[in-house]
């Protein structure tokens, strides 16, 4: 608020969005709660982000998705004078006409300029928000007349995305990974003139911070750079940092004996990490391992059924994995294996 975050909010944001450590994230959240209780509107905006799902916060952070509560908090933060709340409310469709009338800013532009000032002074999260304003087209709320000069969306992107690129890079330099996906889209579009050297430098730097990007970087090393073993090491690193997909990918390699000696016991441990992290493929593998009695696991049909059902009902379960689970569950229910 008033052009800068409180020390508590600034520290909490770094803990929640740059540590990828659940204990530190809990500490950061407690700091936000305390600040919010003392009337800090920015704290409310960041608390709201915690409940808006994995597009807004690390999926393994331990926050439950609560859209209704998040909307109320985001709108309240905007009406209390948080420029962060205003910009985030636009992105999450929470800047309703009534909220816009009630906020103490004369316009969206005024709120944007406050965040821009913080970004220019080096705040990484504000750099990210400024980049988003350009990337998603919200800059046309800042300068509505600019819309007249663009023929279509691509014409706008050709102007705005190179600007967004610069702000995303500044956010990366500040240790924030949140804009990486958008940055990759800019590179793929060819509109941002991002060289391979710059792209790979940021990719490696952010992979050292984010478990999710670490997994993706492992895939990049394996498929694009032809370094399968280095990619595996990145999968294992990501798994240790809490990324379920990294754990599953590494487990698959150890199970198949690709680039390394086959190690079913280690594969099982990695699949269990993936399963406990909520990954449907990992849950299926744990069901299969219990069904067959693989590795150090004794055959346990009840456990197998439990894992197969978790995978089957997982909202992110693919059709292929769902079909595999259904086949094994059919056998279990038909034969009374682990279902009685």
Which residue ranges define each predicted feature?
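Inter-repeat boundary and helix-capping residues of tandem alpha-helical solenoids
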Residues: 1-8, 25, 37, 64-67, ...
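Canonical positions in the second alpha-helix
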Residues: 35, 77, 116-118, 171, ...
């Amino acid at each position: 608020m008033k052009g800068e975050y409180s020390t508590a909010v600034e520290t909490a944001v770094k803990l929640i969005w740059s540590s990828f450590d659940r204990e530190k994230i809990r500490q950061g959240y407690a700091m936000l709660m305390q600040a919010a209780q003392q009337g800090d509107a920015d704290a409310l905006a960041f608390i709201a982000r915690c409940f808006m799902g994995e597009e807004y916060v690390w999926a393994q952070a331990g926050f439950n998705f609560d859209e209704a509560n998040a909307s109320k908090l985001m709108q309240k933060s905007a009406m209390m004078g948080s420029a962060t709340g205003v910009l985030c409310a636009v992105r999450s469709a929470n800047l309703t006409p009534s909220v816009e009338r009630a906020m103490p800013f004369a316009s969206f532009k005024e709120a944007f300029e406050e965040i821009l000032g913080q970004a220019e002074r080096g705040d990484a999260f504000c750099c990210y928000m400024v980049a988003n304003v350009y990337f998603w087209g919200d800059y046309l709320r800042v300068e509505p007349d600019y819309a007249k000069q663009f023929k279509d969306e691509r014409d706008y992107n050709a102007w705005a995305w190179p600007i967004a690129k610069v702000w995303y890079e500044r956010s990366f330099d500040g240790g924030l990974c949140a804009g990486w996906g958008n940055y990759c889209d800019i590179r793929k579009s060819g509109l941002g003139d991002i060289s391979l050297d710059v792209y790979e430098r940021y990719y490696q730097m952010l992979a050292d911070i984010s478990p999710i990007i670490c997994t993706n970087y492992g895939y990049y090393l394996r498929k694009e750079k032809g370094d399968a073993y280095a990619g595996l090491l990145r999968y294992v690193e990501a798994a240790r940092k809490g990324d379920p997909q990294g754990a599953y990918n590494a487990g698959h390699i150890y199970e198949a004996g690709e680039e390394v000696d086959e190690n079913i016991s280690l594969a099982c441990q990695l699949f269990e990490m993936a399963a406990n992290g909520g990954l449907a493929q990992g849950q299926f593998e744990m069901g299969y391992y219990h069904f067959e009695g693989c590795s150090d696991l004794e055959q346990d049909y009840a456990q197998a059924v439990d894992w197969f059902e978790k995978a089957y009902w997982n909202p992110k379960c693919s059709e292929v994995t769902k079909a595999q689970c259904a086949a094994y569950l059919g056998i279990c229910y038909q034969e009374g294996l682990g279902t009685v």
